[in-house]
Amino acid sequence: MAIFRIDEIRNMSSEELEEELRKLEVELIRERGAVRAGGAPEKPGRIREIRRTIARMKTVQRERVRK
């Protein structure tokens, strides 16, 4: 799953944004599950990056609603 920059997120349609957000949330659950199962994550900073990207996406969604 790609980590998106804010300009890439703003250029997405609302439907595309929803779809990518769902994919990232599933990936975050999978990564957290792997850590809780006792395994070391392949990329330790991945969870943090996923969380930040989700926050960026939700921010853009909220900006669109408020307009």
Swiss-Prot record:
Any GO MF annotation of the entry: structural constituent of ribosome
Domain of life (superkingdom): Archaea
GO cellular component entries: cytosolic large ribosomal subunit
The entry's keywords: Ribonucleoprotein, Ribosomal protein
GO biological process per UniProt: translation
Classification via NCBIfam families: L29 (TIGR00012)
PANTHER family membership: 60S RIBOSOMAL PROTEIN L35/50S RIBOSOMAL PROTEIN L29, LARGE RIBOSOMAL SUBUNIT PROTEIN UL29C
Family: Belongs to the universal ribosomal protein uL29 family.
Entry protein name: Large ribosomal subunit protein uL29
UniProt source species: Methanothrix thermoacetophila (strain DSM 6194 / JCM 14653 / NBRC 101360 / PT) (Methanosaeta thermophila)
Gene: rpl29
